[in-house]
């Protein structure tokens, strides 16, 4: 890969631009790939949470975990509705959502897809480099008084 600038110039490049460009490219690629398989990224997050919990999750619990992901917030409720409408989850009388057998099978397929997405995104990047990049980003978030957390 050819980089955009020599290292001496990269050191002066704006993090706001490069973090935005990385987000746009990676999230755009991920969402386009998931869409080709008939699911949105927020629906995939919901389904992943449901398949990871035999007890299921309430909408409130799902919102507490997923609400801050890429500012999905207000659309999360409709994404949960879609997961139920598509038959990937069912809501019981106690208002707990649980993955259906169809949802579990679909999630298993998507897990393979997600691993291939991750492999492509991380191609040529050692785990040590990735960890360092995340720590740098977390430090920058901290430096400006921001907060971020991913389960």
Model segments located where?
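Charged, amphipathic alpha-helical coiled-coil/dimerization segments
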Residues: 81-135
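Alpha-helical linker/hinge and terminal dimerization helices associated
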Residues: 22, 26, 110-124, 140-148
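Generic alpha-helical structural context detector
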Residues: 17-20, 48, 142
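N-terminal leader segment of winged-helix/HTH proteins
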Residues: 1-37, 41
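N-terminal helix-turn-helix DNA-binding core of bacterial DNA-binding proteins
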Residues: 28-75, 80
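C-terminal regulatory/oligomerization modules of transcriptional regulators
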Residues: 1-7, 57, 131, 135-151
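Residues at secondary-structure transition points
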Residues: 10, 17, 41, 57, ...
């Amino acid at each position: 890969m050819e980089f955009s600038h020599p290292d001496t110039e990269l050191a002066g490049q704006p993090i706001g631009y490069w973090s935005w460009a990385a987000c746009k490219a990676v999230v755009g690629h991920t969402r386009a790939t998931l869409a080709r398989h008939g699911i949105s990224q927020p629906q995939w997050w919901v389904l992943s949470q449901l398949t990871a919990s035999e007890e299921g999750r309430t909408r409130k619990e799902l919102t507490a975990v997923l609400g801050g992901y890429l500012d999905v917030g207000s659309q999360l409720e409709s994404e949960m509705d879609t997961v139920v409408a598509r038959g990937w989850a069912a809501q019981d009388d106690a208002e707990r959502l649980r993955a259906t057998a169809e949802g579990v099978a679909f999630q298993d397929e998507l897990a393979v897809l997600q691993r291939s997405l991750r492999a492509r995104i991380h191609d040529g990047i050692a785990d040590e480099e990735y960890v360092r990049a995340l720590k740098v980003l977390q430090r920058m978030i901290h430096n400006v008084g921001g907060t971020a957390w991913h389960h």
